[in-house]
């Protein structure tokens, strides 16, 4: 169970610390004051290994387009250059942090047959780089993956450790949960 939780730069929350969390908690407040954002941050924190959770949160808020602007809705002040950080402690001594960064890069595609290497076009790609750090019994593990939305509201995810571009890419419009979600990608 989570005992302490911090939210940095997520939606309308610049910084929020929740301490001494119990098994039953109430969030009370006016409309549009951030109650749902706290729950969404907890959702990302509790299951960070599912590669399209970030995009699913936007869909729940009816931001159905998977484009650069809709991804920036996750960041405080719509500032994609900031870092979302979700940090928490568990009652079993585990410490966990989830970081989400927005990125844009220029990507080069060659023709499908890869024979006409002089005929290349460059376009911008964008997505979210998610990093999970987990410390259990003094041993830290780090999990990395990137999520790139596609036009059909699906996403592609790949591990940072892959040396070949997109060698192990998984197309994921929906991925069923794994028995142990923290085994998604082990760095």
Where are the regions that the model predicts?
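Pre-Walker A-like glycine/lysine-rich segment at the N-terminus of P-loop NTPase domains
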Residues: 1-47, 57-59
């Amino acid at each position: 169970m989570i005992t302490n939780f911090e939210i940095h730069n997520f939606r309308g929350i610049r910084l929020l610390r929740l301490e001494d969390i119990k098994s039953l908690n109430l969030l009370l407040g006016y409309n549009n004051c951030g109650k749902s954002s706290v729950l969404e941050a907890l959702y990302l924190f509790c299951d960070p290994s599912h590669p399209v959770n970030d995009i699913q949160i936007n869909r729940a808020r009816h931001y159905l387009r998977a484009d650069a602007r809709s991804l920036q809705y996750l960041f405080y002040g719509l500032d994609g250059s900031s870092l979302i950080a979700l940090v928490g402690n568990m009652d079993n001594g585990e410490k966990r942090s989830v970081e989400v960064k927005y990125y844009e890069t220029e990507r080069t595609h060659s023709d499908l047959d890869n024979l006409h290497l002089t005929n290349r076009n460059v376009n911008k790609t964008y997505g979210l780089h998610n990093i999970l750090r987990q410390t259990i019994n003094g041993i830290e593990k780090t999990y990395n993956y990137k999520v790139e939305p596609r036009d059909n509201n699906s996403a592609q995810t790949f591990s940072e450790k892959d040396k070949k571009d997109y060698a192990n890419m998984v197309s994921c419009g929906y991925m069923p949960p794994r028995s142990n979600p923290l085994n998604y990608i082990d760095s």
